[in-house]
Design a protein with these regions (language model features):
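Periplasmic alpha-helical coiled-coil/stalk elements that build and connect Gram-negative outer-membrane
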Residues: 20-21, 204-318, 422, 426, ...
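Small/polar-residue-enriched beta-strand and adjacent coil segments characteristic
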Residues: 92, 131-203, 311-314, 318, ...
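Amphipathic alpha-helical coiled-coil segments
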Residues: 109-124, 203, 207-228, 237, ...
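Acidic, low-complexity, intrinsically disordered peripheral segments
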Residues: 2-8, 12-13, 18-33, 42-63, ...
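Bacterial Sec-pathway N-terminal export signals of envelope proteins
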Residues: 45-137, 143, 292, 299-333, ...
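Long amphipathic alpha-helical coiled-coil segments
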Residues: 283-291, 404, 488-499
Length: 511
């Protein structure tokens, strides 16, 4: 028995009930993916003091039946590698993930942010490390004594002295011996660097989720083309049969008109399905960085396999210890704590050491060793309220970081529970949709038999065809939702990059 498939985007143009159901399913899927990606991107940008592009732009816009990447999101773009070829490039699920991790703009920008954070740490560390310079000068000067205030005329003493040669060379050292302000700045910058490293890993997880969703949706749209093609073929056979009966005087003209309308409706759906597939492939190509104009085909399908998932408590425990955005937020709190200590340390004294050693004289051949060394104790007395203002700002930043961490912890709980609910619901819907397909196909066969036997007109056949289309569309929708829920659960638990590949191999996320 041939199974006819239709994607949710094509089913919306079918019966009203199927359209509403599919719209709700894709709408809910879009909300979850958008929330997961936006939460990840905002976690990367939270409290970051390093320079570089912000990744907190919303990744998905709108809550529609079709999940669309926002053009403003860096995760919707990539840096294409290579040049397009005439050959059709086979792209597997794993290959798409690997390409996205290499070429996606979001992960590349976050990698640059990590380098920027590393540079900021070195800048802060330089305040505690010795600053050593060397210089050599040779000059000649002539001095007017009157310019110096010696306006008296003494016998035998010239009014102008010189030219006098001056030579000096030496090594100069400056060293901060004690500065709690600088020490805590270094500690804060180190925490920021670790946060940037975790944010980079979180960006990779976001890319996996975005790529996985785009790949799965492309599979659904490809199945939609097959569905629409099969529906056109079925409608064509019905029209041919009805038209032959009309010509033979067996069926009325209205039956032929009804069959013709059904055929043209299915043809319109096929045109729309092909267009949707072509556009979705462009979206996928942009995310993973394929060369512009490169033809490719998907080599993996989306089979259904029940997922062996862990309990909610175990999943939450793993998420709190594994999610890179949560670990980054913890480092942001630590950085804010050190920043506050650094601001308070502006009240404390500092000790600096400076010295130099070298040669000085009238020229290189007539010079002698000279040196100078000294220590400076700086004690702040009153700085016009600057330190108080710095402490207030640092304290406010610390409170914000802690609040954002608490909010993210609650969001992780929601993400994990939502993903598990979606996974369970989608699995149940897949089973129901399978049964609906069998029943709809049986109904279509019986309607065709009744029509061929002349018991009824072709209205029953047309209605049965719509039921088959809706049933297969529901199956595709639930299958897409189930596989997306797997990817979303891996993301919610904090190991999307490893978890997606794992579920593809074993359908077990509990390992």
């Amino acid at each position: 028995m041939n199974q006819i498939f239709l994607t949710p985007s094509q089913a919306k143009r079918g019966t009203l009930s199927g359209m509403k159901e599919l719209r709700i399913r894709r709408w809910l899927g879009g909300i979850f993916v958008a929330a997961a990606l936006v939460a990840g991107a905002q976690g990367q940008g939270t409290g970051t003091t390093t320079s570089g592009p912000s990744l907190s732009t919303p990744l998905y816009s709108g809550a529609s039946s079709s999940i669309m990447l926002s053009p403003q999101s860096p995760y919707s773009g990539s840096v294409p590698q290579g040049k397009a070829t005439a050959d059709v490039l086979p792209v597997s699920f794993k290959d798409a993930i690997d390409r996205g991790l290499r070429n996606n703009l979001g992960v590349l920008l976050q990698s640059d942010n990590e380098i920027s954070a590393r540079g900021q740490r070195w800048k802060e560390l330089s305040e505690l490390l010795p600053n050593v310079t060397t210089s050599t000068t040779q000059s000649a000067e002539q001095i007017d004594l009157a310019e110096l205030g010696l306006r008296f005329n003494f016998p035998g003493v010239p009014r102008v002295v010189g030219p006098i040669g001056v030579f000096q060379t030496g090594v100069y050292l400056q060293q901060t011996v004690l500065s709690l302000n600088s020490i805590n700045k270094v500690r804060s910058a180190s925490a920021q660097q670790r946060a940037a490293r975790f944010s980079y890993q979180d960006a990779r997880d976001v890319v996996v989720l975005a790529t996985g969703n785009a790949y799965l949706e492309t599979i659904a749209d490809a199945a939609g083309v097959d569905t629409a093609t099969a529906q056109v073929a079925t409608a064509q056979r019905l029209f041919d049969k009805t038209d032959d009966q009309r010509k033979a005087g067996i069926s009325p003209a209205i039956d032929a008109l009804r069959a013709k309308v059904e055929l043209q409706t299915r043809q319109q759906q096929l045109i729309a399905a092909k267009n949707d597939l072509a556009k979705q492939k462009l979206v996928l190509a942009r995310i993973i960085g394929l060369p512009p104009g490169q033809l490719f085909e998907l080599t993996d399908k989306a089979p259904y396999a029940p997922l062996t998932a862990m309990s909610v408590d175990e999943a939450l425990k793993r998420a709190y210890t594994s999610r890179a955005d949560y670990l980054a937020a913890e480092q942001q709190v630590l950085a804010a704590e050190f920043t506050k200590k650094s601001a308070a340390a502006e009240y404390y004294p500092t000790i600096d050491l400076a010295g130099d050693y070298g040669d000085a004289g009238v020229n290189v051949g007539n010079s002698h060793g000279v040196f100078q060394v000294g220590a400076t104790l700086n004690i702040p007395i009153f700085q016009g309220g600057k330190v108080h203002g710095d402490v207030l700002q640092a304290d406010a930043t610390l409170k914000q970081s802690r609040q954002q961490l608490d909010s993210l912890r609650a969001q992780i709980d929601s993400d994990v529970r939502t993903a598990m609910l979606d996974l369970q619901s989608a699995a149940e819907q897949v089973e129901v949709a399978r049964s609906s397909i069998d029943l709809a196909n049986q109904t279509l066969e019986q309607a065709q038999d009744r029509f061929n036997a002349g018991v009824t007109d072709n209205l029953e056949v047309v209605q049965a065809q719509e039921s088959v289309a809706t049933a297969n569309a529901n199956y595709i929708s639930s299958l897409y939702a189930h596989n997306l829920a797997k990817v979303s659960l891996a993301r919610a638990m904090g190991f999307a990059e490893e978890g997606v590949k794992l579920y593809l191999e074993s359908n077990d996320l509990s390992k």
